């Protein structure tokens, strides 16, 4: 399936990193003011926070393609495989050649009736007034949460329904709740979240007592523990957990 979410340019969202509310159309430019420029990171992190789902990859289109909306771009790519080559050489991306190939095959194989488009302006945004009296379109958090769970749930994670516990092993509050939202919207079965005994963990890790690594375990490891895939922790609170998968968050999880 292909899910397309249209977010009006005038939508205000909280920019990741504590920069306050900005129009989504301005978030990339805000990030580009950093040294070094971080426009893509600002935008992807802010969208991930807004929708409550992980964002694994991006394509930044050049001016020859950026005037196409998402539906037009997909139709353009499906018309001719050569157009995928044009996309590769006329965009910047964090996807490698193999991932771009898989994207091409995936887009080309999806039936037209399996492409779903949702415009947030229809029923997910509210007209509001910011403290400085600026008129703004703000998201309805409850509706966005329901939408994200519906659109972005991973069918395999949802089917496995393994119990997942989340531990915050840092002194920064709120990390476990943020991770729980991401995992739940992917269809994960989060049974609890709490602070670990350890409070200075650098790299996050994902642990399981099972010798057979499940799809859910591998997906969460790629999401949270790219820097620590064979790590372990001596922590009394974590070791008492009866969850099938334990996600232990370190300082690298922002």
Predicted regions and their residues:
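Non-catalytic, solvent-exposed segments at the cell envelope interface
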Residues: 1-254
């Amino acid at each position: 399936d292909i899910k397309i979410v249209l977010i009006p340019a005038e939508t205000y969202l909280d920019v990741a990193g504590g920069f306050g509310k900005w129009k989504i159309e301005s978030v990339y430019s805000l990030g580009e003011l950093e040294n070094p420029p971080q426009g893509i990171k600002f935008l992807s992190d802010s969208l991930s926070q807004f929708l409550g789902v992980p964002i694994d990859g991006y394509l930044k289109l050049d001016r020859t393609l950026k005037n196409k909306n998402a539906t037009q771009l997909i139709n353009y790519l499906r018309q001719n495989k050569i157009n995928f080559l044009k996309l590769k050489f006329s965009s910047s991306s964090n996807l490698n050649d193999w991932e771009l190939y898989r994207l091409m095959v995936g887009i080309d194989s999806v039936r037209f009736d399996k492409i779903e488009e949702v415009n947030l302006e229809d029923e997910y945004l509210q007209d509001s007034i910011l403290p400085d009296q600026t008129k703004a379109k703000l998201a309805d958090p409850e509706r966005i949460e329901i939408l994200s769970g519906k659109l972005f749930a991973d069918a395999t994670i949802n089917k496995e329904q393994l119990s997942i516990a989340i531990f915050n092993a840092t002194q920064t509050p709120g990390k476990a709740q943020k991770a729980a939202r991401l995992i739940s919207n992917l269809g994960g079965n989060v049974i609890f979240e709490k602070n670990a005994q350890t409070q200075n963990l650098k790299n996050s890790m994902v642990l399981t007592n099972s010798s057979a690594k499940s799809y859910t375990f591998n997906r969460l490891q790629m999401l949270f523990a790219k820097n620590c895939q064979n790590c372990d922790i001596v922590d009394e609170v974590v070791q008492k957990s009866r969850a099938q998968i334990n996600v232990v968050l370190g300082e690298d999880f922002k």
